[in-house]
Amino acid sequence: GTASGKTLCYNLPVLEALNADPNATALYLYPTKALAQDQQRKIRDLWPDLCFGTYDGDTPPTDRRKLKDRGRLLLTNPDMLSGSVLPHHDSFNRFFSNLKYVVIDEVHAYKGAFGSHVSIVLARLKRVAEKYGAKPQFIMTSATIRNPKELAEGLIKEPVSVVDNDGAPKGQKTFVLWNPPFDESKGVRLSANAEANRLFVSLIKKRVRTIAFVRARVTAELLYRYAVDELASYGLADKVRPYRGGYLPEDRRQIEQALFSGELLGVTSTNALELGIDIGGLDACIIVGYPGSVSSVWQQAGRAGRGRDESLVFLIANADPIDQFIVQHPDYFFAQSPERAVIDPDNPYILLGQLRAMAYELPLKKDEVAQLSENAPAVTELLAEGGQLVPRGNRFFWMAKGYPANDINLRNISENTYSIVEKLKDGNQAIGSIDELSAFTQLHPEAVYLHNGDTYLVRELDLEGKIAYIERADTDYFTQAVTERRVLIQEQRLGRPFNTATFGFGDLDVTFITYMFRKIKFYTRDSFGFGSIGLPPSTLETCGLWLEISPKEVSLVLKYGRDPREGLLGIGNVLASLMPLYILSDPGDVGSAVDSSNTGKPALFLFDRYRGGIGITEKAYEIMEEMLPNALDVIKECSCERGCPSCVGARRSRQDLLDPDASPRGKLPDKAAALIILHSILNLDEYVPPEEESETPWEVKPLSESTEKRLRQMLSQIKEKGR
């Protein structure tokens, strides 16, 4: 659990072993550089004379040489281990020869694509250690998840013992589940962001040290911008900062230090501050929207009231189905986490890069490749056919040019990362980076990009050079891209009937077409204009499950004048939103689409949003019978009449999740059609939708052509003023 003394549990035995054996070494792995640097200060207090340190991209060359020559304890992250340490293992031969312990902190962070990569990085670590005669013991720590043993054993491919007694000191923590009221006149729930801003500003004005966690980078910037505007008149504008991924390392360190020292009163942050970086004692935590897992809620809540201090935590529900499920079922929160962490080291796209790196480090033996995963031998043969490897007897040798570890991005499966470059009068300056799918939706020409509370206009997206060029511009609006999805089944791997419906699972091609963007006003969130996007379609090769309904469901829906596709779209929105309740994943890891082009019948698709898949929808395929009744409950329990973002409508993908309040204002997926379909495939009584008020016809006398023209000009001027 959070603040349960896990760090001390591994520091004491490891440091004792290093003290007993003057040659012994140990490796500490943290999911982020910031965590490693934070822990360095604590170890220095325990053993000032120990030769140790962080080994990451920020480590100066002189310190790197010292750690290679004399270092007893290295604190690093999987990215650095994969990209710099293992490929140069010969210069670390003393360290690896004496390696006694490997500590992996925050194991629950190693899920999905990241965890799938790290499992193979750890296999690379073990084979390098074996070359130098070492067989280190692994110690792992985790927040509460449902399957810690399964995840840990999946990562290191060895049996583990679980220790789960929590003896942490705990101060009183007041936990508030906050559901913004439903606005019947607009048919939507009031803004979670606006509620969060009101709370955040109120707490800062009372000088209550507060962190506000949000689910998207842009939302962190928006909340900060709103807060600064209100706090300026109180002389507190410089007492708050935003914090998120994409900032330069020195900027993040400066914010962390300002929080720790008490210089700052508040911070708006993505989950980048969720893990155990020591930012001092905060008094309050605002969680804007369910972050995707119970463990994340408690990790974020644990940033306030460390030790025995009292603290206040608000979880403000968004309109998403999962948020509404949580606030309607509060007992779920205070029970043991039901989520499973999933990794898939058999992903062929992950294996392609990792096997190249393995062969560069040491020749690949056929038996170790076969033990790595089911697809590893086939991918190895492909590498040999492509001239990357040369087979000799039972081994494969690296023969290609280059440095293959540089081609691996552990945090994603896409090799396409775009740099964000600000155009300045005296040259250009890189201010961040982003993956390709996000670049197409956030950095298209004319998009507004937010960074550190400032607004920038995107002037160019260089697809060949993978660079987005931006310029500083003061705007009173931000942008949100609109995408269309098409799904093609490449190969069906699994299938089974379910009452009148059919489940399937297999390999999919999902094509994303980003064709337009909205302009949305700050504060009011009104959409006041559109623009076209001329970017090429992008295709995601992944895996996913599908639900195909029978002619019976189609007939029932049509009988009531509804569209089956709109019903399936609503069911997909609910299922994708509820996914993190069952499988430890991030909001947006799973996408949904409705397509009838594969079989001629309407089908709902749920797919992993990573190349090759990461196992989420494969696990979901096994538990669909458990998920569908809960999806029905979410829709039935919602107080809306026709459908809203709290049940069937407007769930946002990772790319669309720029501002949770800027949901589409147009027609929502059909609640009644979703209920008709679910009642039928769950063998319940036929659902009869309530009669709706019929539209009253009226006679519209056309205006004269000249009058209509003048009125249109006036409206255009009014709209322009509103910008």
PLM regions with names:
Residues 137-140, 317, 359, 363-437, ...:
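Extended, highly charged accessory segments
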Residues 159, 284, 455-457, 603:
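Conserved beta-strand residues within beta-sheet cores
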Residues 1-82, 86-363, 370-405, 414-415, ...:
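Helicase motor core with emphasis on the C-terminal RecA-like subdomain
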